[in-house]
Regions:
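Metallocofactor- and cofactor-centric catalytic cores in central/energy metabolism, strongly enriched
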Residues: 2-9, 25, 30, 36-37, ...
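Short, well-ordered amphipathic alpha-helical segments that serve as non-catalytic structural scaffolds
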Residues: 5-20, 45, 49, 73, ...
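Beta-strand segments within the central parallel beta-sheet cores of soluble alpha/beta enzyme folds
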Residues: 23-33, 59-65, 89-94, 145-152
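Conserved catalytic cysteine-centered active-site region
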Residues: 36-88, 92, 96-128, 166-192
Length: 199
């Protein structure tokens, strides 16, 4: 079983190799992660990943912004270079979820909801997105076929990555006939529970 640290280390090592730089030139590391604490019992990822990569005593920070965590890490890495704090910074995004049950993962993801408003009424993200789709359809006439076209477009883009979690194209029938998660959302309209990293 690959740990959240091992996933991050592999992605970062490959990125450093791909960039063609000596890792000793990296002056900062930012890691974007949302649920390593509740799902893996592991926090303080910045320092641990920096150590695993052998980067020495450099500033290392974990940032969290739910689904935007990796993007936030990338932004901070760019800003540290733009500000002249370092010539090279690395951003890593990582999540490990599949070792936990759907209920445990859902509860962890729900921590991104505002507990004082959304959480009190029992919302989940698929539930909120299902409601948002209904509202969008009411105002703009959004159809099932239009949403399926977006799913297919995203799937096509994902298949360009040989490491993609789901390595096959979906037909419109696959999408429409997948099980209901939160009406009108079906399985393939939703993000899968996954393990992965990028850098």
């Amino acid at each position: 079983a690959t740990s959240v640290i091992e996933l991050a280390k592999k992605a970062a090592s490959e990125a450093i190799l791909d960039a063609g730089i000596d890792k000793t030139r990296i002056g900062a590391l930012y890691v974007g992660n949302f649920v390593s604490g509740p799902l893996s019992g592991q926090e303080v990822l910045g320092g641990i990943i920096t150590h695993a990569l052998g980067l020495g005593a450099i500033p290392a920070t974990k940032v969290e912004g739910a689904c935007a965590s990796g993007g936030i890490a990338f932004r901070h890495a760019c800003l540290s270079v733009a500000a002249g704090l370092t010539d090279y910074a690395i951003a890593v995004g990582v999540e490990k979820m599949t070792h936990q049950s759907t209920n445990v993962v859902t509860e962890a993801l729900n921590s991104a909801l505002d507990r004082e408003t959304d959480g009190e009424v029992g919302h989940t993200f698929p539930g909120l997105y299902g409601l948002a789709w209904r509202l969008h359809a009411k105002h703009y006439g959004t159809s099932r076929a239009q949403v399926s076209a977006v799913v297919k477009k995203n799937k096509r883009a994902g298949l360009k990555n040989p490491l993609a979690q789901m390595g096959k194209m979906l037909s419109e029938d696959d999408i429409i006939n997948s099980r209901v998660i939160s009406d009108p959302l079906r399985l393939y309209d939703c993000c899968p529970v996954t393990d992965g990293a990028s850098a």
